[in-house]
């Protein structure tokens, strides 16, 4: 009996230890999780930045998300960055390491604020569905993610989320412009990597906004 209780106590200890590595905050619009206890300090700030950005994009893009947006904060890379997708669900992955300034221009002290502004533009641009998109999503039971094993799935995926297949330069151009605008004129639009988008718009005498 003593051996059983000792084993049970050790098991519960390790279970609690493993679960405590992750912290999660849920709101009506977001599920935000950190992958390490060392990142928990940023969650409160992250949820405020996420809601501020989403409220801004709601007004700008007339975007009304139909599902929660999952945000994961991690520190798996050497430089801060983010990624976003709308397939099959809305997901943002954010590395909160210091930014790389070799080809980019960002707000160093507020990289969480800047990254969330940028990545939520992607979510709004990718997930903002028309009536036909919503009809196909209802028909297929959600947004379809394409599979390399079944190339025809790309067609079904396009029907449910056509803006996912827009050129990357278009999505990045929108995101860096709005991000820089929201950051008060300091952002990736000033970096030489993304500046090509605006040079092209000026060269073609096209309307930027």
Question: Where are the language model's segments positioned?
Answer:
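Residue-level marker of positions within ordered structural domains that often coincide
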Residues: 10, 18-19, 62, 180
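Juxtacatalytic substrate-recognition/specificity segment
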Residues: 20-160
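Post-HExxH zinc-binding segment in Zn-dependent metallohydrolases
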Residues: 53, 128, 132-208
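Sec-dependent N-terminal signal peptides
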Residues: 4-16
């Amino acid at each position: 009996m003593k051996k059983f209780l000792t084993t049970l106590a050790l098991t519960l200890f390790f279970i609690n230890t493993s679960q405590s590595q992750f912290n999660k905050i849920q709101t009506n619009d977001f599920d935000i999780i950190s992958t390490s206890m060392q990142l928990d300090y940023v969650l409160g700030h992250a949820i405020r930045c996420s809601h501020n950005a989403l409220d801004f994009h709601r007004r700008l893009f007339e975007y009304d998300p139909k599902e929660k947006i999952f945000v994961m904060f991690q520190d798996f890379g050497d430089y801060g960055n983010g990624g976003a997708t709308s397939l099959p669900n809305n997901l943002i992955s954010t590395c909160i390491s210091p930014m790389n300034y070799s080809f980019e221009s960002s707000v160093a002290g507020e990289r969480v604020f800047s990254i969330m502004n940028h990545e939520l533009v992607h979510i709004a641009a990718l997930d903002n569905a028309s009536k036909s998109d919503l009809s196909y999503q209802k028909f297929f039971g959600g947004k379809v993610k394409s599979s390399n094993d079944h190339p025809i799935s790309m067609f079904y995926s396009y029907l449910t989320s056509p803006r996912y297949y827009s050129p990357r330069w278009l999505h990045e151009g929108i995101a860096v412009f709005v991000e820089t605008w929201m950051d008060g004129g300091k952002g990736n639009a000033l970096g030489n990597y993304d500046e090509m988008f605006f040079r092209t718009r000026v060269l073609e005498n096209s309307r930027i906004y």
